[in-house]
């Protein structure tokens, strides 16, 4: 929906405004491979793919795993994409 697109655009803009490019550092776990965790409930999460240099969806089982899982693609991008 157009409301969802506007929200996404707003979040991306906020992320870019809050963290100056020159001082941004990638989240320490962005280079780790995706780890689905080991609990029973499965939800959609996003991880940073270092080979493709983008955030991708994967099924996260809700606990454990590593830090390379984010609730939204926007959060993944904010934490893991660093622009030169």
From Swiss-Prot:
Pfam families: Kunitz_BPTI
Tissues with expression: Expressed by the venom gland.
UniProt signal peptide: 1-23
GO CC annotation: extracellular space
Disulfide bonds: 30-80, 39-63, 55-76
Domain BPTI/Kunitz inhibitor: 30-80
Subcellular location: Secreted
Principal localisation: secreted
GO molecular function, one term: toxin activity
Transmembrane segments: none
Keywords in alphabetical order: Disulfide bond, Neurotoxin, Presynaptic neurotoxin, Secreted, Signal, Toxin
Keyword Transcription regulation (UniProt): no
Cited InterPro entries: Kunitz_BPTI, Kunitz_BPTI_sf, Prtase_inh_Kunz-CS, TFPI/VKTCI-like
Family: Belongs to the venom Kunitz-type family.
The protein's role, per its UniProt record: Beta-2 bungarotoxin is a presynaptic neurotoxin of the venom. The B chain is homologous to venom basic protease inhibitors but has no protease inhibitor activity and is non-toxic.
Assembly mode: Heterodimer; disulfide-linked. The A chain has phospholipase A2 activity and the B chain shows homology with the basic protease inhibitors.
Record-given protein name: Kunitz-type serine protease inhibitor homolog beta-bungarotoxin B4 chain
Organism from which the protein derives: Bungarus candidus
């Amino acid at each position: 929906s157009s409301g969802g697109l506007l929200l996404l655009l707003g979040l991306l803009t906020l992320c870019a405004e809050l963290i100056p490019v020159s001082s941004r550092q990638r989240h320490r776990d962005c280079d780790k491979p995706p780890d689905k965790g080991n609990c029973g409930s499965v939800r959609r999460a996003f991880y940073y793919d270092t080979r493709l240099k983008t955030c991708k969806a994967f099924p996260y089982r809700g606990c454990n795993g590593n830090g390379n899982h984010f609730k939204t693609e926007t959060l993944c991008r904010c934490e893991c994409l660093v622009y030169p």
